[in-house]
Design a protein with these regions (language model features):
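Acidic, metal-coordinating catalytic segment for phosphate/diphosphate chemistry
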Residues: 1-11
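Short, surface-exposed beta-strand-loop junctions and turns on beta-sheet-rich folds
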Residues: 29-31, 38-39
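Entry beta-strands of beta-propeller and related beta-repeat scaffolds
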Residues: 20-21
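Conserved active-site beta-strand element of glycosyltransferases/polysaccharide synthases
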Residues: 24
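Charged phosphate-binding loop/patch that engages nucleotide di/tri-phosphates or the phosphate backbone
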Residues: 115-157
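Unchanged
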Residues: 37-60, 65-125
């Protein structure tokens, strides 16, 4: 956890029990689920809330992967990254923070997630670090993936 930077954003690499990653699709761009922590909210609860609001999924086994220092030219802050296990995925629903807006969702292999991310050079190290954490806490078992899991699965309403 950063000690000298405010945490302004929290994102999660959300794994299904079969080892895929859930990506949120906004305007054709695949991203991690997450958002801004509320001042009163524990950081892990921010990710749980955002996962429910943006992707209608319930998560647990939330563990810190690390953080990225961001300098947007006006402020310097941290984006915290977690790995978590998806326990349940419901139908797509509008994000309560953006009335009328429903995100697309897709389940992909970690290798595919790296290719789809708009995060440039940090994409692969981020996913590899998340996998390492998920293995440590026993919720990543990709070595047992059936062939059909290697294909993308777009989640419909």
């Amino acid at each position: 956890m950063p000690v000298d930077l405010p945490i302004r954003q929290i994102y999660g690499v959300l794994f299904t029990p079969d080892g895929r990653i859930l990506l949120r699709i906004e305007k054709g761009i695949c991203q991690l689920t997450g958002g801004k922590p509320e001042p009163w909210e524990p950081l892990k609860e921010t990710l749980s809330r955002e996962a429910l609001e943006e992707a209608n999924c319930r998560i647990d086994k939330i563990h810190t992967v690390g953080y990225q220092k961001v300098d947007d030219g006006e402020k310097v802050y941290a984006q915290l990254r977690f790995a978590a296990l998806i326990r349940e995925i419901g139908p797509a629903e509008p994000d309560p923070d953006r009335p009328g807006w429903t995100y697309g969702r897709i389940l992909v292999s970690p290798e595919r997630a790296i290719k789809l991310f708009p995060y440039g050079d940090i994409s692969e190290p981020l996913i590899q670090a998340a996998i390492k954490i998920a293995k440590k806490y026993d919720f990543y078992h990709q070595e047992n993936l059936p062939d059909e899991v290697l294909n993308d699965e777009i989640l419909e309403d």
